[in-house]
Amino acid sequence: MSSDNNDNNNNHSYKEANYYNYYRLLENNLKKKSRGLFLTENNKKKSKVFKLTKFSIDTEINDCSSTSKWTQIYSNDSKTPIEARYKIPLHPTWIITDFRVESQDKVVVLIGKIKEHEKALNNYNDTIANGGQSFLASKSSIEDLDFFNLNIGNLPPNETVKITLTITSEIGTHINGQLHYYLHHSLFPTYNFNFNLNIIIKLSNSIESIINWYGNSKRILNINSSNTGCGSDDGDDDVIKVLYNNSNNKEIKIKSNDKLNSIEDSLVLIIQPSIINDEPKSMIEYNKIENSLAVSINYYSSFKDIKIEDMNQKSEFIFLIDCSGSMVGEPMRKVKRAMEIIIRSLNENQHRVNVVCFGSSFKKVFKVSRDYNDETLECLSKYIQSIEANLGGTELLTPIKNILSSPPNPEYPRQLFILTDGEAPHRDKIIHYLSKESNTTRIFTYGIGDSVDIDLIIGLSNACKGHYEFITDNDNFEKQVMKLLNISLKPMFSNIKLDLSTLFSNNKNKNKNNNNCKEDIIIQSPSQIRPLFYQERMIVYLMIESLSTRLKDIINDSIENSKPLIITMTCDGPKGDKLSIPIELDLKNNCIISSSSSSSSSSSSSSSSSSSSSSSSSSSSSSTTTATTNQNQIHRLSAYHQIKDLEEKERKKKKDNKTRIVELSKKYGILSKHTSFIVKCESTKPTLESMDFIDIIDQFSFENQVSATKNKSQCLLTKSKKSKTAAPTTTTTTTITKKRFSDVDEDISRQSVKKSKKSETKEETTKTTSSKTKSSSSFDLIDLLRIQRANGSWTKSTISQMGISIGNAPVELSSDQLYNIWVTLIVISKIIKLFPNEKIEYEFAIQKSKKWVKLELSKLNLPNTTFDKFSLKANSLC
């Protein structure tokens, strides 16, 4: 998200959220905005006799997920049987967990069965060929975007059919702990139909506010009226109305306007909890029939009471710089200056760093990121000064793949900064690739100039849950660059692991059979936990598919005696310390006990319509302190993330995990890329008439990538284009010595780094002009930062060369060994006094310096007030 767009009241701020990236790609790639049951040209006449007539959505939202029941009624008013096919977008977090079909006479409800896709498709075709009815629900991908496909086979004339889907999803999250519920307009037909939306929000904390967006219309819902009739003051034309809220605002019911007969725009609810719990929360499901346990853990930390000077967290910083021909001149000069400031804002013994330049090819300074120290800093500084815009075009995917091919180090969370001024081929392919890497890398992007591809910059950062900036004003270049660095240096938890050994250590039978229940296989998903960055939410699932006798005893004892079980989250904290955070599993008051089979909804069966249960209703459970969920919801979310892990292993290691994916899909009734829901309705009176075929499967046709990226309405800030060819240069040579920097990339160390005389002259001219505006100083801020050491200090020898008067040091610092402490205090004061308007540029470098001074003073056993006393003296001399 943009660092400028963190205000809740910003227009369409929900589009900055990471979950929205899927819809951005969808909108950018759709050839036309057709969706749902919008028919192709050949079938427009048939659309009058076959259509969706009713569509209702019943949703329940809790602290971390939502469950929705979609009920759709289709009508065939023609004189012939119909076979219809259509598709709707399927967000990556959506899980189709139930598929039911109800006939017109309402005698039976047919429940879909999960089968491998090929077998399900054969069953579908065979049933139709024999004159019966069949319904097929499947998942597909187009241009790396997932879709849900529904085939309605052999619907007799003058009949209706009701189709019900259950969709489980993690709730969308955004800044300040917001929860977002989003319905994109492409989910709905373009014609009128009867629409009904009912939402129940049940949170563990009270709700402060709910904002409703419908297209460009924004409205703050009235949730603080009397317990009933909260929407009585709402206008007749409002899309959403509040029906009910309880006294503590933890439960709120919302419904759509009864007059709503179409959905022309996207609809979003932004739910703001009043309190953000600064501790992990758990939700538990205990399935007695399946003998299984599933746990979801969600954690949003405010990182309160963390002072900047106390922070000592580790991170890896990689800077990927566009050196294509269009960056020649002022853009490259600005990038180089910004990079000089950035590399001096990092910290010794905390950070690792690397710089990669890309164009038609790419070059890395180091083969792998190096520890940040004086040698690394010197090498990077020389290299940055030598960078030119001479690498041709903008081939971004290759260097990104190279960077991400290195396994992430959990102790050094990887943060990638991309600086570019143009477009990149295969934009959506790059974004899709990065979306698979969000657990390994966080990405920050800078769009430089007026011709940058907006969707590339936003898409790259959102794919890996990062932030972005557009830089069109050269005067604020460095300030905007430093904004994102500021975010990257905020507190976080890294190297997160769940210690489950404590799960068995606080029960009365702990001395019996003391093997920590080794027979209990506990599956964590996702298997790799993303660092918990500032203003992010962590959600992790645990599942035990078959409980041992001992663990069942532990669970029952916990329930009977109100004795919570404990698991421990270990991590590296912002202060550089190892943290152990207990997580309570309160099975007495916060556990849903299920008595149904996980796979019951995916078995082929029929039941009376009266026995059809609503997915949005609460399952039977003991009294809970958090919102209840539907039966086996946490089991299914856990299984879904296991499937995602297996698919990722297939992608990276070329390993075939189809068998296990199909097994999980069948057991938990989850639609996957290898499976489909199939419903067959064998008829005693087979339909022998020929069917009319309504082919609406190709409605989501895509432009090719080249035309998509060139579409000015989607990509560009202006119509202007910059050349992507390398600018001709006259060169001089600066050599990086391989002997000293033995791990410098061979391509860099072999070559002579060329520097353009033309660029050099322009830089000196600009620098001279700039220096005239400085407050009576004969040097620029960057001149002082260039001679700063990696630990934040300055030395007497380097400062003397610049003609800076140091004055007499305090007696305590007058020895040669301590004199650099005084020198550093003098330079800090000089910078603050001479460059008051550039604070954001030097802020981190000065913080580093102050931290070093305080550390050195602490070794001398001087009073706590010594730093302030010496700083005042230094200020008086400047």
Swiss-Prot record:
Protein name as it appears in the record: von Willebrand factor A domain-containing protein DDB_G0267758
Segments forming domain VIT: 36-169
Chain ranges of the VWFA domain: 316-496
Biased composition (Polar residues): 624-635
Low complexity bias (residue ranges): 595-623
Entry-linked Pfam families: VIT, VWA_3
UniProt-listed InterPro entries: VIT, VWF_A, vWFA_dom_sf
Location of the region described as Disordered in the Swiss-Prot/TrEMBL record: 595-638, 752-774
UniProt superkingdom: Eukaryota
